[in-house]
């Protein structure tokens, strides 16, 4: 979730010494903590992660750069910088991919964000969205519905395991972001579990399949579906 801050706040933090972006996220976290004192929060590079009971929200403070929809957001990595983003271009890219994949991009992205949270996968939410938007429009089963989501997840994870150290092009700004490989071992583990789950389903071992899916997504996934 992004929210726009007044430009005066930007100038105030520009006068800081040291990591201005880290100071901004710290102030955002403190203000949110005053409103939600019982909620766990932490800064994570470019966002403040707010862990409510039923949902985790990534809060992104931003400053308007121009009237075409581009913004500056904080990036605390490597000493800190202001990173330009174009949310409208990113939304348009996801919309087009979702249309080409028969409405399956957004549900898939939500499922994979659940995996990210449950297994502490070090991929950003926007990276997951862009990866799903890259994968789904050319996926052979993209026209199928949720009855095929087990195959969707399995095949996406197989594909994802070949994406280490590749670059993502961010829509709008055309920035290249390298994916690295810190997430790879968790993706490989999830891939292997998804493969086993699909094999168990094929053999009608639905509870064994459910156990594997719960290892990926947590116990909000039912262990057995009639």
Predicted regions and their residues:
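Metal-dependent nuclease catalytic cores that hydrolyze phosphodiester bonds in DNA/RNA
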Residues: 11, 24, 135
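Conserved nucleotidyltransferase catalytic core and NTase-mimicking acidic/glycine-rich helix/loop elements
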Residues: 104-225
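Conserved catalytic core of two-metal-ion nucleotidyltransferases
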Residues: 15-70
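Aromatic/basic-lined ligand-recognition segments
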Residues: 65-98
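Second-shell loop/turn segments in exported
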Residues: 98-99, 119
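Acidic, low-complexity intrinsically disordered regions
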Residues: 3-5, 56, 139
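Long, hydrophobic/aromatic-enriched structural stretches that serve as scaffold segments
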Residues: 1-18
């Amino acid at each position: 979730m992004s929210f726009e801050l007044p430009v005066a706040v930007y100038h105030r933090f520009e006068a800081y010494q040291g990591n201005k972006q880290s100071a901004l996220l710290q102030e955002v976290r403190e203000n949110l903590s005053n409103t939600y004192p019982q909620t766990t929060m932490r800064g994570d590079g470019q966002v403040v992660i707010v862990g409510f009971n039923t949902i985790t929200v990534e809060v992104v403070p931003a400053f308007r750069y121009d009237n075409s929809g581009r913004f500056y957001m904080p990036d605390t990595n490597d000493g800190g910088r202001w990173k330009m983003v174009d949310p409208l271009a990113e939304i348009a890219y996801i919309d087009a991919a979702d249309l080409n994949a028969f409405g399956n991009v957004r549900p898939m992205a939500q499922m994979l964000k659940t995996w990210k949270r449950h297994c502490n996968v070090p991929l950003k939410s926007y990276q997951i969205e862009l990866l799903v938007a890259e994968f789904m429009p050319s996926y052979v089963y993209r026209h199928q519905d949720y009855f095929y989501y087990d195959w969707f997840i399995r095949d996406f994870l197989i594909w994802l395991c070949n994406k280490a150290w590749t670059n993502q092009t961010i829509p709008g700004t055309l920035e290249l972001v390298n994916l690295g490989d810190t997430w790879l071992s968790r993706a490989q583990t999830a891939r292997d579990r998804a493969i086993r789950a699909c094999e168990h389903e094929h053999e009608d071992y639905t509870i064994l399949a459910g156990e594997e899916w719960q290892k990926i997504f947590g116990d909000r996934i039912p262990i057995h579906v009639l």
